[in-house]
Amino acid sequence: MNNRAHTFLWGIRQFRTSIPRSRALRTYSLVFCKPEVIHSKRNPRNHLLNGFDEGLQPSVRYLFQDIFISKSVAGCTQTRGIIHAAGFKLDRILCPRRLSFDAKHSFVSDGTSDHDLMKTNFHHTSTEDVLTKKMRPTPVNYKKLAQECNSLSDVLDTFSKAPTFPGSNYFLAMWIIAKRISEDKRRFEKQLMFSHPAFNQLCEQMMREAKIMRYDHLLFSLNAIVKLGVPQNSLMVQTLLRTIQERISECDERCLSILSTALVTMEPCMNVNALRAGLRILVDQQVWNINDIFTLQTVMRCIGKDMKALKELGRFSVLNSRHMFEVLAAMDHRSVVLLNECSKIVIDNIHGCPFKVLISILQSCRDLRYQNEDLFKSIADYVATTFDIWKLKHVIFFLLSFETLGFRPPGLMDKLLEKVVQEPGSLTVKNIVSVLHVYSSLNHVHNVQNREFLEALASALTGCLHQISSESLLNAVHSFCMMNYFPLAPINQLIKENIIHELLTSGDTEKNIHKLHVLNTCLKLDESTYKCIHIPLPQLPLTASHPNEKLAEVLSRLLEGDGCFSRNVQLPHNYHIDFEIRMDTNRTQVFSFSEGDASSATNMQRVAVLCVPKSAYCLNSNHLRGLMAMKIRHLNVMGFHVILIHNWELKKLKMEDAVTFVRKKIYSDEALATTDESV
C-alpha cells in the first residue's frame, strides 16, 4: 500500500514537471445553469484528491474542468465525476471554487497501473476539443445582447435557452433596451418581464452569483435592477444590498461612483441605511485620493462633501462646472463658493451650451435658492442673441424658469413679444397661458407694442376657447386682469355659470377662488365694461398681518404719538395696508384721525404705508412684480397715495437714521425743504 501511494505521488510530481501548467490547467468561469450531472461508477467511498498542486495556496480553491485524478483505495481505483453541460474558456482564473470532475476525461481511469501513469499522454486534447464545442455556449456580451433583442422578453428568452455566467449581463441588457423605448412601451414591457417564466430563474441565479461576481458587475446589476422597477423590498434586491455591504472593502474609485449612483435613487431602509453609512466611512478614507471629477461629483451627490471639490476647482472643465449645479441641487447642498466659481466658468463658455443643460442650471439655482444675476443675464442675453435658432417652446421654457427665479430679462422678453405680435397663430393654448403668466408676473410692459401684444394674445386665446380647460381659461384671464386688459370673449366665456361652478367644485378650489376674487376686484376698480358684473364667491379668510414693529416705532417718533396713524387697516376687495396716515393734499402736514374726519375730503390725502420685502421686486431691481403693481394701482383708485418702505433697508438702520429715512419717504420735497430752512 505504501509503495503504491509513493508511486502515485511520484507520478503527480512528474506530471507537474513534464508540461507547462497552462497546458494542464484549463480554467473556466463558473456556470450556474443547473448543469446535467452524470455520476460514473457511483460508490459512497468515492472522493477526490484535491489540492494536488503544491504551488497553489491552500486557502484558494480553483476551478478546473476535464482534469480528473482518481485515488486508489484498498487496492482498487474508485472514481466519481461530474460533467458540466455548459462552460466557456477564459485566459485566467475568474473565481475560486471547488469543482468535481468526470472520470471519463480523467488522466487516469479504472484499471490503470502505477507504471502506466508515467506513460499517460498529457498532450492529447482532440477528444477534449470535440466535447468543448458541444459544452461551451457563446459568451454573452450585454451590449451585443441589447442590440440583438428588441424587448425585455427577448432577453429573457435568450437566457432561458442557454443561461450563462454572469446573470448581470441580462439585467444590463434589459436596462439598455428599457432606456431606448418610450415610456408607455417601457411600462408594458416591464409587466411582461415580471410575468415571464424565466424571470424568477434569472433572479435566483443573480442571488447565487452575488458572492462570486466581480464587485463592479454586482453594483451595475443593482443599479439596473432598481431602474427596471424591481421592488426594493424584494428578496433579490435585499440580498444584493447585503452582499454589497459584506464586500464593500473591494470598492475602488470606479465602484464608488457606481454605488453612489445606485443609492441616490433608493428609498431608505435598513440595508440601504447601513450601506450608506459604510459608504460614508469609505469616502472619508478615500475622498482625497479620488482623481476623476465626475466620480467626485457623484460621491458628493450621495455623501455631501465639498472640501475636496474646492481644492479641485482649478481642474474643473466646462462640462464639470455645468454638471456641478445638478449635483449640488440633487443633494440639496448650497455651497455658494462652488456655485460662484462654476458660474464664472459657465458664463465664460456660454456659447454652444445645449438647451437641456441651461434649463438644468436654472432649475438647480431655483432649488438651491441661489441668485446670481450675472449668470442669469448671461443666459438670457445668449438666448436673445441667438433667438432665431431656438424653438418658440424653448424660449417660453427659459422665461418660465426666469420667472420662478424672480429675474426679468427685458431684452429676451421684448424679442418674444415682437415674435408674438408678428405670428400670433403659432401659439398653442399652453404657450398662451405660459406667456401671459410670465409677462403678468414680471410686470413687463413694452414701450411701443404693448397694446398690440395683448391684443394678439387675446385673439389667439379667443380662437382656442373651444378646446381650453376651465382652469387654463381662469389662469389666462387672471393674467390679463393683472396687466389691466379685459378681452371680451374670454371673460364672457369664463363668467358662465357652469364654468364658475366647475372652478368652485373641482381642482385647486382655494387657488381658483382667490383668482376669481381678483377678477371681481379688477372688474370693479379698473376701467372695464364689466363694472356691473359680480361673481358670487365664498368669502376669503382674513390673513393674519403683523406690521413691522420697527416701522411702527419710527412712525410714533416721527408723528409724535400713535394718534396720527393707524395700523393694519383692512380695506374693501380683500386688501389691507400696514399703516394709514392722513395728510393734506400737498403732503406737508399730518392730521390726527379726529382732525382728518373733520377735514374736507378735498383737502385730505389718505396715505398707505406698505412695508415690502425683496420678493415684491424683480431680482436686484426696483421693478415691481405683477401682484404688488396691481395692488398699488387699485389703492390709487381707492384714493390712497402709496409709500413703499423696504424692510431690508429699514432693518439695517439705527433708530435715528430710520426716522430720517421714513421722513423723506412720507413728506413731499416741498415740506422737507421748508423743514430744512427752519432748522
From Swiss-Prot:
Keywords: Mitochondrion, Mitochondrion nucleoid, Phosphoprotein, Ribosome biogenesis, RNA-binding, rRNA-binding, Transit peptide. SMART domains: RAP (SM00952). It comes from Rattus norvegicus (Rat). Residues 607-664 form the RAP domain. Plays an important role in assembly of the mitochondrial large ribosomal subunit. As a component of a functional protein-RNA module, consisting of RCC1L, NGRN, RPUSD3, RPUSD4, TRUB2, FASTKD2 and 16S mitochondrial ribosomal RNA (16S mt-rRNA), controls 16S mt-rRNA abundance and is required for intra-mitochondrial translation. May play a role in mitochondrial apoptosis. The keyword RNA-binding applies. The keyword Lipid metabolism does not apply. Monomer. Found in a complex with GRSF1, DDX28, DHX30 and FASTKD5. Associates with the 16S mitochondrial rRNA (16S mt-rRNA). Forms a regulatory protein-RNA complex, consisting of RCC1L, NGRN, RPUSD3, RPUSD4, TRUB2, FASTKD2 and 16S mt-rRNA. One of its GO terms (molecular function) is rRNA binding. It is found in: Mitochondrion matrix; Mitochondrion matrix, Mitochondrion nucleoid. The gene is Fastkd2. This is FAST kinase domain-containing protein 2, mitochondrial. Belongs to the FAST kinase family. GO terms for cellular component: mitochondrial matrix; mitochondrial nucleoid; mitochondrion; ribonucleoprotein granule. The modification Phosphoserine is found at S113, S126. Coiled coil: none annotated. One of its GO terms (biological process) is mitochondrial RNA processing.
